[in-house]
C-alpha cells in the first residue's frame, strides 16, 4: 500500500503493508493506543508461546495474555476479554493489581501493589506505575509510583508524577476539550476526553491536580499552590524560568536513580531548544 504523506513540508511516498495510521498530534497517541496495542500484540506474539501464568492469579481470556521471559505476576486479576495483555521481559506486576486489557507493561517496568488499570494503557520500559490509570501511554523511564488518577493522557520519557498527582479527563459540561497546539498557536478541540500531555523530563509535586486537557512542555518542575495553568511552556520552574545548569543537574539526579546519566547528545539537544 502506497501512501503519500507530508513530513516537514515535503511530500514523502511511504510503502506499508496492512493498516497505516499517521500521527499528526500528541493526543492521538492515546486515542489510537487501542489499535496500536492490538497490532503490536499480534506481531510480537506470533508463533511464540507465553511463559506460564502463575496459578495465584485470577485470569479471564488466557489466549490473549502473554508473559515474556522473566516477567513476574502474582496474586492479581488479569481480564483480557476486552483486549490483549502483554507483560514484558523482567517486568513485574505486584500483588493485588487489577488489569483490564488492552494493556502493555514493557521491559523492566513495575506495576505496584493494588493498581487499577483500564485499557488501552501502555507503561513503557523501566517505568514505575501505580494508582488508577486508564487509556494512557507512559514512555520509558517515567514514574507514576503512587495513588492518583491518570486518564486519556500521554507522559514523556524521564517524567515523575508526585504522590497524589491527578488529572481531569472530562469537562464538567461534558463538552469538547480544548488543548494548546504549538503548531496552531492556539487552543483547539480534540474531542470529549483528554487529560494530561507531558513532555520529557518534566515532574509534578505531590497532590498536583491538572485540569482537563493540560499541556506541559519539556523540562518542567511543577509546584504551585493552585491548579496549574492549562499550558505550561518548556523549561518552567514553578512559575519562573528554569536555569539550564539546574536542568542538567536535576535530570542527571533522576537518571542516576535508574543507572543512567545525561549524554552529550541530550545536553546538545536541550541546549538548542533552551536557546530558541
Where are these regions (language model features)?
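Terminal amphipathic alpha-helical/low-complexity segments used for targeting or macromolecular assembly
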Residues: 1-64, 70, 225-276
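Extended beta-solenoid/beta-helix repeat architectures
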Residues: 48-156, 171-172, 197, 215
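Glycine-rich hexapeptide-repeat left-handed beta-helix
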Residues: 113-114, 120, 126-276
Amino acid at each position: 500500500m502506497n501512501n503519500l504523506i507530508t513530513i516537514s513540508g515535503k511530500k514523502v511516498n511511504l510503502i506499508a503493508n496492512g493498516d497505516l495510521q499517521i500521527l499528526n498530534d500528541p493526543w492521538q497517541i492515546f486515542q489510537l493506543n487501542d489499535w496500536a496495542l492490538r497490532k503490536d500484540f499480534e506481531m510480537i506474539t506470533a508463533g511464540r508461546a507465553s511463559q506460564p501464568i502463575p496459578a495465584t492469579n485470577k485470569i479471564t481470556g488466557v489466549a490473549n495474555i502473554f508473559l515474556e521471559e522473566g516477567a513476574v505476576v502474582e496474586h492479581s486479576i488479569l481480564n483480557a476479554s476486552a483486549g490483549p495483555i502483554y507483560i514484558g521481559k523482567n517486568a513485574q506486576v505486584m500483588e493485588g493489581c487489577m488489569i483490564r486489557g488492552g494493556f502493555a507493561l514493557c521491559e523492566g517496568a513495575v506495576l505496584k501493589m493494588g493498581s487499577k488499570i483500564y485499557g488501552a494503557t501502555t507503561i513503557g520500559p523501566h517505568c514505575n506505575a501505580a494508582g488508577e490509570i486508564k487509556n494512557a501511554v507512559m514512555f520509558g523511564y517515567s514514574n507514576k509510583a503512587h495513588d492518583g488518577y491518570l486518564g486519556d493522557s500521554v507522559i514523556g520519557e524521564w517524567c515523575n508524577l508526585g504522590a497524589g498527582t491527578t488529572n481531569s479527563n472530562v469537562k464538567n459540561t461534558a463538552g469538547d476539550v480544548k488543548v494548546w497546539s504549538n503548531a496552531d498557536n492556539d487552543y483547539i478541540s480534540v474531542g470529549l476526553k483528554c487529560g494530561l500531555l507531558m513532555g520529557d523530563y518534566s515532574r509534578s509535586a505531590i497532590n498536583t491536580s491538572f485540569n482537563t486537557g493540560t499541556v506541559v512542555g519539556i523540562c518542567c518542575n511543577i509546584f504551585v499552590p493552585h491548579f496549574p495553568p492549562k499550558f505550561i511552556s518548556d523549561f518552567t520552574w514553578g512559575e519562573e524560568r528554569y536555569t539550564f545548569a539546574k536542568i542538567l543537574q536535576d535530570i542527571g539526579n533522576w537518571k542516576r536513580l535508574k543507572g543512567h546519566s545525561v549524554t552529550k547528545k541530550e545536553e546538545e539537544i536541550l541546549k538548542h531548544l533552551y536557546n530558541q
